[in-house]
Amino acid sequence: MLKLLLGDPNARKLKRYQPIVSDINLLEEEIEPLSDDDLRRRTAEFRQRLEAAGSLDKQRPLLDDLLPEAFAVVREAGKRVLGMRHFDVQMIGGMVLHEGQIAEMKTGEGKTLVATLPSYLNALTGRGVHVVTVNDYLARRDAEWMGQVHRFLGLSVGLIQQDMTPAERRINYGCDITYATNSELGFDYLRDNMAADINEVVQREFQFCVIDEVDSILIDEARTPLIISGQVERPQEKYEKAAEVANALERAAEMGKDGIDPEGDYEVDEKQRSSTLTDEGFTKAEALIGVADLYNPQDPWAHYITNALKAKELFVRDVNYIVRDGEAVIVDEFTGRVMPGRRWSDGQHQAIEAKEGLAIQPETQTLASITYQNFFLLYPRLAGMTGTAKTEEVEFEKTYSLQTAIVPTNRVRARQDWVDQVYKTETAKWRAVAKETAEVHKQGRPVLVGTTSVEKSELLSALLAEENIPHNLLNAKPENVEREAEIVAQAGRAGSVTIATNMAGRGTDIILGGNSDYMARLKLREVLLPRLVRPEDDHRPPVPLQRSEEGGGGFSATAPASGPHGNAPSEAKAIGNLYPCQLTEETDQALVELAKQLVKAWGDRALSVIELEDRIATAAEKAPTEDPEIAQLRASIAQVKGEYDAVVKQEEMGVREAGGLHVIGTERHESRRVDNQLRGRAGRQGDPGSTRFFLSLGDNLLRIFGGERVAGLMNAFRVEEDMPIESGMLTRSLEGAQKKVETYYYDIRKQVFEYDEVMNNQRKAVYTERRRVLDGRELKKQVIGYGERTMNEIVEAYVNPDLPPEEWDVSQLVSKVKEFVYLLEDLQPDQLQGLSMDDLKAFLQEQLRNAYDLKEGEIEELRPGLMREAERFFILQQIDTLWREHLQAMDALRESVGLRGYGQKDPLIEYKNEGYDMFLEMMTNMRRNVIYSMFMFRPAPPAAAQATTA
């Protein structure tokens, strides 16, 4: 009703963009006839106009004025290089992003292409633009694919990947537009603020950032801080003993009247993800370990037991982690991907290693940390894209000051969302999923089944294998995860069945009939890899190919040939019938000749896998090239794609007529948004498609957040195990449960943000001080400033202004000054007699400056420049050591203030107040320690040093 009275605010916002879209369309006629060189020259012209404006504040209004012309130039470059023309709605999406908002654009509407518009415009300032994706694969794909547009227009494009060296990172961050993952950006920021030398710093000042899948990064991952850790030795046997004790303890089956079952040793709260020992549990655990008190500070055990119980009950193998090569590797709960190198903190990872009988790695201590919330707020301008932002609109606005605009689709949606089906048991649900998958598969339609864990995906895989239904598996298991792109490339083929763990945020569209462009590139890779790639580098994951005898459309799966570690041989071919047809003899022969020519040009097995893939990616571009080998490679890709296209187009028509992609959800996620992301895989760009969710009373959402009501209804109506319930009331009940969970997690994220905001202000102050030191500007002035403040603090500690001067303890004051500055050993108390408090401070500051000049003379005689090096070393050493200790102290404070809520005190206010006092004390200690270290610094003379060495 309110919308009817006041009008739709989103519609009003979009209406404002329409005249600008008209301007861009008019410019298209003017720009279309330009030569490639003339089009590129526009970039130089734009830059000259911006440079003439001067400061960034003056450039911003000019950027808005340049927008229509710049967007028209990018549209034309997209047509020439990618063969893709930005639709009008994509222009609107680009404007939303340029204004620093979130653009909600449905799956398949070309979000990746939209990002080229504001990226190009804001990169013209020369201050750098970051385009952020959720994983290395997508960052690489977008840098190669969309980077073509920017490179064509004369901008430099950088890419940050996990295995890059600092030197490579610095070069790539120095580019006009840099593609990177959220975690790499965050960790590089933290590492830069731990650097010992300015040359180790890789990032430059932040300016503009566009985040793809913004809800995944700013909402889903906001609860987890980025942490850089150092190792701390803890007794391994404690983890092993705790795991043994946890296995001997029994879980409370039901909650008693007081919240605890008297017959259980511990209770588990799945909602809070915590475990608590009962009184009986404490007694039993102490007896099993042979100690009198689990909380004895000299021999603490409680923390180890709590972590062991959580590892036993809340961290499930093949759901939360997988075991690979003797290590427990975390599985991302939102994307289903493994996260090698990441570890749970606070001893939790060690508890899981003990549970699984793995080698226990040393525990870690936090050296630096930041939440994604505070990291991305460092950007002066922040924007994001996603298919599902509206459900989190309030949080985006409150936490990040980001407004959300819903960009209309280019074509009307034709997808059908069928009603949820709820079963009493999980067994019945999985049978129903397998049955519907088989039925839709027989119709010749592709099916995508979304599961929530590796374990569930393998359960369904086994059920489908029993029915002889060919399928592909995409989950966190190493043999599957590396083949993600090619599995998705064929997920739209007629009759294909793909089981995927958490498709949310995977960033790859499923194209009906299959992706002929990717198939052609993979075919070239398969042919060239054995001839061009060094054998030792040829360790890419399995991609075995079995060619369909029919050589036509349709999907046939075959078991992959296994290599020595369960992986397929690395000549790398594609699982199942990836290629839609056999190539003609003429094309096959042309590929053989191409391989020979490239061996001559690039050497026999002389490239790395990445180098080969880079060259294939470059050849797949449409941008002009003067490299004869790349041109040859490009012609071969076009020849192969042409043959595949003929079959793929025909297959696409058949899939459309059959009803398009059918998406099956096997569990409601805690967030409605993630469910919508899965649904959004079907019906892209007006394609036909359908979706349905299959649920059971055993699903986590219903079990933890309110399944009793539904179970009561089913029992009341005596519903059979294999009979589903479909009802509006049930759907509303489920959505109500999801809203409860969303609110619960929003409160957690809000609390994380509020507490980290305290740390954030302190972090900014410390990192600003550190950067001053790294930049090396006025180091002496900085240290003397520390000394002057230290003198003031000594005076304030030993002089009481309320007492007459003759009662001041000047002797103690002088002794304390000499402790810090031994060069003032001749200072006598009578020199301070008769001075006021302010005069005392001024006198001691003057004495300190004189002493520091003397010290500098001593040190510089040994080697010019040594004093500045010492200043830099001691300041950085003290900042890093004390900041590390401060982080530990703040963690301990945060845990302890939680209990103060029982004393009618606000824990957050207590945390802020005490944290501030602790921070001031840390900074004071840092200044004092630097002054003490500088005056005590006595390097050996060069001659003495040489004699010692000899």
From Swiss-Prot:
Keywords per UniProt: ATP-binding, Cell inner membrane, Cell membrane, Cytoplasm, Membrane, Nucleotide-binding, Protein transport, Thylakoid, Translocase, Translocation, Transport
Chain spans, region Disordered: 257-277, 535-568
Cell compartments where the protein resides: Cell inner membrane; Cellular thylakoid membrane; Cytoplasm
GO cellular component: cell envelope Sec protein transport complex; cytosol; plasma membrane-derived thylakoid membrane
Residues binding ATP: 90, 108-112, 509
Catalytically driven reaction(s): ATP + H2O + cellular proteinSide 1 = ADP + phosphate + cellular proteinSide 2
Catalytic EC class: translocase
Enzyme Commission (EC) number: 7.4.2.8
NCBIfam families in alphabetical order: secA (TIGR00963)
Stated name of the protein: Protein translocase subunit SecA
Organism name: Synechococcus sp. (strain CC9311)
